[in-house]
Every structure is written in structure tokens, then in C-alpha cells.
């Protein structure tokens, strides 16, 4: 209770007691005195509570009817043909411009369009990105004075423009003059989207051809051709030979009772073939895998045929003649006047592994499929028939995977890793 309410209540009580005392006469009881309501009190039938206020509350403002938001999802599903291509995507952008002349809600629509670009297959189209930037109102978000340039003028709009440029960067799309002209019209030269554009124009030409082993942008959908390219991409020896041991049969040729026939593609170099011929038949070799290899947004799996590292006493050191040695002389001892602080030796952790004799990619990762690969290798490597082969296989969901928005492969559960390690130990002991 506030002090105003307490003052009014005390004043009313004083007046009430005064009226009762004046009305009381000798010989009359208090019950006969007529009840007089004080002027300061306003009694009601409802019980008084401390939450009720004596001051009247202001009238509630009238609520305007809320307008329903435009369902932007429906704009991308109204294509007459029903196909998700570039034409239907641009048609959805055009419908948004016709529906909202004042460009109201353009930021939400641009964010939605950026998420839908992969579904329509236009994530690498520069004209579509320029069309999205053209949705922004022109000459509205440009800073007019120094204060607006110091602080981020219209930050939400600038973040949306940067999001468009970042998606262009992630897909390797180089902006052009039209992109620069649109950003100048929308945000001005002294803005963060324009700074992002200048960085893209600076670093993209420098990093475009930095990969010494480039991967084509459009990869083949044929699993045999994709496996051949993946094996060639991993094998450093140009004289290595790719062999197709088994071709997958079409679905029409195989019946319901016949098992599917996966493809098997292998690669082996002459040096690997010679090393396998020199291998001791008493020591087993291992088929390990599958191991993942990412080719842009596609993931393929491969297996290797390898052996354990020989102990130091069984290793043979090959001496290279001087006329064949490209690094001759091998040792050159020159004494320079160096102090004790000059240390040119670095600590490098090098792990020596056993030799790898061959690699393959198969449509299935079971032991029966890989046994066919070993049988095919025995035709060119007769000594392989005398060497015991141990299969160390892990679990894999499949060969061909296309990455989604995250471009990352989920890690396997921990319990599967423990089971796989136990199986490897048991197979190694056997």
C-alpha cells in the first residue's frame, strides 16, 4: 500500500469516528445510531485487498489486428512444372518482388533463398547471387555522414549481404563487376560487404590453382569411373596399372534370387609388384579398410593390401650407385664457425609403416567381395597364392556418399571402435 492510499484511508476513518461520536446521545445505544458513510470512504460489497488501487487504471489501448506473415516457403513450391531448377528459383524471386513492392521482409527471404539454392542446383550460379543482391532496396542503407560510417549502419542488412558473399566464397564463385556495382548501390563503398568483396577479389585469383592435384568440378556418377579416378588420384606412380576385376551388373539383368554383383577396381605399380614378389611367404599380409577419400562433395572408400614392418635385423639396405643417385654426394661434412646456439635439427615424429602392395575400391566391403580382388591379384602375382591373407575390415555404411550442408562425415560411435579394435586383435592373433 502506498503512502497516498494510507493517507486517504486514515482521513476517512477519522471522519467516520467523529460522526459516530456526535450522533451518540445519552440513553441511546450505539446500535440505534444511524449509519453514516464517511465522505472519504467508498465502501463496496467486495472485500478490500491490498492489491486493489484507489487510483483508476488507464484504459487499455486497442490492439490492431496483426497481419499474417507472408509464407515465403510457398513461393518456392508454386512452380507450375514442379521441377526444381534455375527457372523456378528465379520465378520465386520474381514473385517476391511483385508481392512486396516496398521490399518488406527481404532479409528473411534472402536467408531462405540461400538455404534453398542447393535444392535447386544454383549454388554455383553467379547470376542467381546477383539476383538475390538486387532484392535489397537501393540508396537506403548507404551511410550519409562520418558518424554512420564509424558505426555499423543498418547492421542486420549488412550481415545479410555478407552472408550472400560468404556462400559465394564457400562454393568458389568469383564476383564480377555487376556484384560490385550492386553492393555500391546498396551499402556504399565504405561498408563491410564491400570490404568482403575486395578480399574475395584479392585472394580468389591467388588460391584458385594452388592445389597441385586438382579435382574436376563435375565428377562422374559412374562408380567405376569414379573409383578409377580416385585410385589414380592417390597413386603417385604414373606407371601404375588400373585393373577392373568386376563390373556391376544392371538391375534388370539380375533376378530377385541372384545376389548383386558389385564393382571391383584395383591399382598396382611395378615397384609394388616386385616388392610383393620378394615378400617372405611365412609372414602374413593384411587387407585393411575401408578408408575414406573425399573428392569434393563425394566420399569413396578404398582398401589396401599391406604387410607389417620388418624387424631391423631382417631389413636389407639397398645401396644406390653414384651415377644413379640424384642426391650425390649423400654426405657432405663442412665445418663452419657456428656457435653452440645454432641448432638446425628439428624434432620430427616419423612413424614407419609396412609396405603397401596394392589398393582397390569395391562396391561392397565384405570379405567375399575382397576375396575376389585377391584372386584377381594372383594372376599377376603368383607368389600371392602361397602367402596367408588376413582380413582386417571395419564397418562402413556404403561406398558413395554425397555431403549435405555440413560437408562433414559423422564420426563413428565409440562402441563400434572398441568392437573393431577387438576384432583386429583377434584376427591378428589368429
Curated annotation (Swiss-Prot):
InterPro entries: ECIST_C, ECSIT, ECSIT_N. Adapter protein that plays a role in different signaling pathways including TLRs and IL-1 pathways or innate antiviral induction signaling. Plays a role in the activation of NF-kappa-B by forming a signal complex with TRAF6 and TAK1/MAP3K7 to activate TAK1/MAP3K7 leading to activation of IKKs. Once ubiquitinated, interacts with the dissociated RELA and NFKB1 proteins and translocates to the nucleus where it induces NF-kappa-B-dependent gene expression. As part of the MCIA complex, involved in the assembly of the mitochondrial complex I. Residues 47-56 have a biased composition (Polar residues). Disulfide bonds: none annotated. The keyword Nucleus applies. GO terms for biological process: cell surface receptor protein serine/threonine kinase signaling pathway; innate immune response; regulation of oxidoreductase activity; regulation of protein complex stability. Residues 41-66, 400-430 are annotated as: Disordered. Ubiquitinated on Lys-372; leading to translocation in the nucleus together with RELA and NFKB1 and expression of NF-kappa-B-dependent genes. It is found in: Cytoplasm; Nucleus; Mitochondrion. GO terms for cellular component: cytoplasm; mitochondrion; nucleus. It comes from the Eukaryota. The keyword Transit peptide applies. Pfam families: ECSIT_C, ECSIT_N. Residues 1-48 form a transit peptide. Interacts with MAP3K1, SMAD4 and TRAF6. Interacts with SMAD1 only after BMP4-treatment. Part of the mitochondrial complex I assembly/MCIA complex that comprises at least the core subunits TMEM126B, NDUFAF1, ECSIT and ACAD9 and complement subunits such as COA1 and TMEM186. Interacts with NDUFAF1. Interacts with ACAD9. Interacts with TRIM59. Interacts with TMEM70 and TMEM242. Interacts (when ubiquitinated) with NF-kappa-B subunits RELA and NFKB1. Interacts with RIGI, IFIT1 and MAVS; these interactions promote RLR-mediated type I IFN induction. The lineage of its organism: Eukaryota, Metazoa, Chordata, Craniata, Vertebrata. This is Evolutionarily conserved signaling intermediate in Toll pathway, mitochondrial. Residues 411-420 have a biased composition (Acidic residues).
